[in-house]
Amino acid sequence: MFSLQELCRKNIYILPYPLGEHVLQQLGLYWKGYGSLQRIGDDHVLLQQDLIFSINEALRMAGEEGNNEVVKLLLLWEGNLHYAIIGALEGDRYDLIHKYYGQIGDCHKILPLIQDPQIFEKCHELSTSCNIRCLLEHAVKHNMLSILQKHKDQIRFHLALTQILFELACHERKNDIIRWIGYSLHIYQLETIFDVAFAHKNLSLYVLGYELLMHKVNTEAANIDLPNLLSYHLRTAAAGGLLHFMFETLKHGGYVDKAVLSAAISYKHRKVVAHFIHQVPRKTVEKLLLHAVQTRAPKKTLNLLLSSLNYSVHPITKQLVRNVVDYRSTLIVKLLLMRRKRKLNLVDAVLARLVRYSTYTDTVKFMGEFSVSPEKVIKMAARESRTFMIEMISKAVWKNHPQTMIHHLKQLADTMKPQSGKDLIIYTIHYIYQSSNLLVAEEEKNIFKLAKFYANHNSVNRFKQICEDYYTLDVDTRFKTLILECFEIAVQKNYPRIATIVDDFIRFLFYKGDITEEEISEAYSLKNAELYVDLKWLQQEEN
């Protein structure tokens, strides 16, 4: 046939009318027994100007008849060869199959198009390299239960094959086949059906799983730990928020406990918690609240648990504080503060634990969330000997300005009660002083005040050092004033070591001629001054 004629046959849609049977036969547009054959659109044919079929249905009919000429024409019209093969199998036209065998490719691709189990099996036989297991697996995939029933005896004697087919049926979600295997054959592991049901949230498959499980329990001496299995299923269902799965499980036993509701909380399924929360003891609810804080549960879940406890959480306050800090979960603190009645302020308790155990970053974040004053945090840090925390917060709050930092820290030291905390703040002040290059004339007044501050707090070594530093500024008159005022402080507050240091500086000033005997005598005339200094040196100088 000429290529032009082939091209016309492939693309002609409207036949010149009328054409005789002989002409149509010559054109290859005639189907014996039906009449003229005409293409309509992209995927239909018209027979004898009357009957309309899809191209693929026409291919199946032609294949069943073994009519290769019509098959070739319909393939030109973009029909699917697989339908011709199906028709040939239905008509036992193996000669036609042989002609196209090289074009078929993988015969397994034809199987989804077949509804008849016998044709299905015949088609599978075209793949000479396949075995019975391959046939049975494809029968499962394409829901050919009758094929499995036909080969039941072969399956029965291969336990591993039974399990393979069962698991395949579960993954393909072929419930009829699953049920047949479950009742007709022995399955040693049922868990796959539940795994697939959970994965696809398929309740009907889950119900079927329990139907088979109970059948197995009642009819076989199966070694099944049913309570443990039920508990596992409840936890899994709760974690997935599958409330109806939980109802189905509870029909067969089991109970909802802390582990089950903890799973629901962890995966944020509040509806599951809401349904069962009133069925568990108060102690369990308290543990669930702690778990909710640990997993940073959303506001609605926390409120649900708090409401169940009537917002009374005093028995677990310490654990709550620990979880808030350890898991950086502060929402519960805010919710308890928002209550008009039964309000519980955990801010100070949480803050104390943060300062003791957590990082500077976590502490500052909490300060911002709850508007905590830096002074409060610094005092807590001083009590816990967190020097780094004091320094970092001071720098952050007071813009790393040395004079401002020292000013505020001095105020805190003045009001700090524990001596260890006071000493740590003073240590921090001196560190800031030393590392900030404040020993300049412009800072003379601030250094003067700082020296008196050290004297007031009996910080002996720092007092001595800052006095030596102050003297280098060449402010002799002011230095003398500082020394005399600090001597008065030492006497009034009973600080003998400060008094001794002052006495040394007074002698130094006297020998330099920067202070007179009268000034010294006046300073040492204070009540009880003789208890702190030895005036003999001055009397010797007079003689």
From Swiss-Prot:
Q: What induces it?
A: Expressed in the early phase of the viral replicative cycle.
The species is African swine fever virus (isolate Tick/Malawi/Lil 20-1/1983)
Q: Hey, which family's this protein in? A: Belongs to the asfivirus MGF 505 family.
Its protein name is: Protein MGF 505-10R
Q: Keyword set for this entry? A: Early protein
TM ranges = none
Q: What does this protein do?
A: Plays a role in virus cell tropism, and may be required for efficient virus replication in macrophages.
Give the highest taxon in the source lineage: Viruses
